[in-house]
Amino acid sequence: MIAYILKRLLLIIPTLLAIMTINFFLIQSAPGGPIEQMMAKINNTQSKETQGLVKERSYRASQGLESDLLENLKKLYGFDKPIGERYLLMLKKYLQFDFGESFYRQIKVIDLIKEKLPVSISLGFFSTLLIYLISIPLGIFKAKRNNEPLDVLSSVVIIVANAIPAFLFAVVLIVFFAGGNYWHWFPLKGLVSDNFESLSALGKIKDYLWHITLPVLCISLGGFASLTLLVKNSFLDEMGKLYVVSARAKGCSVGRIFYAHVFRNAILLVVAGFPQAFLGMFFSSSLLIEIVFSLDGLGLLGYESIVSRDYPVVFGSLYIFTLLGLVASLISDLLCVVIDPRIDFEKR
């Protein structure tokens, strides 16, 4: 097992390198950039005009600007160096987790990520936890009562819930429960109250949970369907295997067969997928929710950095996200071994 872990850790290096290389050259070749946007701001031009000028690959937006100012802008953003040199310099710094400074925020990228991280971790972790706590029992319930009226009804409910956009559900919750036209049970925005620091330890926990309730519900809404059906189908698949038939023939009770034998095999894939499910919620499901509830997290940061061509933030976030994804994949494999020691990855 140790040899397998070492092999997977070594494979992280070329995988991470390939992903960063592809994204570096794709983003560098995309139209627009920080220099063009800065010149547009200086000239008070509209963003549409700037984009049109960039498509022509000219610096007409710099008309009226002195050439030395243009050179200073290039030097400021590091574009005075060849693209190959910029790429190698980026890799060298990233090995030391030095992502540079944001072009527009005047703060180190690593500090910026640390600042936004608690919001996204909160949303991702609690949403994933809620989905698992509901979907696993519900999936087992549906497997036991396959094709019965309650199974069909619950399938309709979770499929309809899955079809509702998270941002639309967020607006509905705000209207009804966050000071819209009905009740003011939950706060409208933010992760904590203004007087958070003055609260007791228990008060801080209650305030924190009070603020994340609605965002977590919105993000979780679309995650129930796939996991619930996965749990159900996993149990149904195991129930049809020969070892279950043999156990029944030997007189084992249905409950003993289900929980002593079927459960461990069926739940293996579901539990092992928790790290990657968390990262999926963490990275991709919170952007619109962060916007609606005014939560300044990594989803909003990534979107704004891409739009503004803030390359240090884009590449720094991508590097961290990719690294976490690769580590989560390894953790998933290790969870498989913990749940079922018969699995041997060293033969792979």
Q: What is the predicted role of each segment?
A:
Residues 16-82, 181-204:
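Hydrophobic alpha-helical transmembrane segments of membrane transport/permease proteins
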Residues 23-29, 157-189, 218-224:
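Membrane-water interface segments at the C-terminal ends of transmembrane alpha-helices
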Residues 12, 116, 120, 156-159, ...:
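Residue-level signal for discrete positions within transmembrane alpha-helices
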Residues 2-3, 117-118, 126-127, 131-150, ...:
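Alpha-helical transmembrane segments of integral membrane proteins
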Residues 69, 74-136:
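An internal, D/E-rich "acidic patch" concept
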Residues 6-12, 16:
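N-terminal signal-anchor/signal peptide hydrophobic helix marking the start
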Residues 17-21, 87, 125-129, 172-173, ...:
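Hydrophobic alpha-helical transmembrane segments of multi-pass integral membrane proteins
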Residues 19, 23-27, 32, 170, ...:
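Juxtamembrane/transmembrane-helix interface segments of polytopic membrane transporters
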